[in-house]
């Protein structure tokens, strides 16, 4: 009767060894999925936003994160932008708060 128990223990050890490989495979698979579904798209967005920040020049029409639309009047060295909202209102904002660049003439059409 004891020989059945030895065979059963040997089978359990082999099964655990096979499960550890499948566990490692699953873990690597999930890491790859997270990388390509979450991290990679965010890196692309950050790169596009950085390119937008570097391309801002006086005269560009932009939209901010708070929804303000305005024309860039001046870009400072320390990362701030003087944004002209209308003929009488100008505000200083950080470059990072600019979401997108608008086509020329957008402000006049509103």
UniProtKB/Swiss-Prot annotation:
Biological processes, Gene Ontology terms: protein transport
Q: Supply one GO CC term from the record.
A: plasma membrane
The scientific name of the source species is Buchnera aphidicola subsp. Schizaphis graminum (strain Sg)
The listed locations are: Cell inner membrane
> Under what name is this protein listed?
Sec translocon accessory complex subunit YajC
How does the annotation summarize its subunit structure?
Part of the SecDF-YidC-YajC translocase complex. The SecDF-YidC-YajC translocase forms a supercomplex with SecYEG, called the holo-translocon (HTL).
> Could you tell me the membrane topology recorded for this protein?
Single-pass membrane protein
Name of encoding gene: yajC
What residue range is the signal peptide? none
Q: What does the UniProt keyword field contain?
A: Cell inner membrane, Cell membrane, Membrane, Protein transport, Translocation, Transmembrane, Transmembrane helix, Transport
State the similarity comment: Belongs to the YajC family.
InterPro entries hit by this protein: Preprotein_translocase_YajC
Q: Where are the transmembrane segments?
A: 20-40
A Pfam family that this protein carries is YajC
Q: What does this protein do?
A: The SecYEG-SecDF-YajC-YidC holo-translocon (HTL) protein secretase/insertase is a supercomplex required for protein secretion, insertion of proteins into membranes, and assembly of membrane protein complexes. While the SecYEG complex is essential for assembly of a number of proteins and complexes, the SecDF-YajC-YidC subcomplex facilitates these functions.
This protein's record includes keyword ATP-binding: no
Keyword Ligase attributed: no
């Amino acid at each position: 009767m004891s020989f059945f128990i030895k065979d059963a223990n040997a089978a359990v050890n082999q099964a655990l060894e096979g499960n550890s490989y499948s566990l490692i495979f699953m873990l690597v698979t999930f890491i790859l999925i997270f990388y390509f579904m979450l991290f990679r798209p965010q890196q692309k967005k950050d790169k596009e936003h950085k390119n937008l920040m570097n391309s801002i020049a006086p005269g560009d029409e932009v939209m901010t994160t708070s929804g303000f639309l305005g024309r860039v009047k001046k870009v400072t060295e320390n990362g701030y932008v003087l944004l002209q909202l209308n003929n009488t209102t100008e505000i200083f904002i950080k470059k990072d708060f600019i979401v997108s660049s608008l086509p020329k003439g957008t402000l006049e059409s509103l």
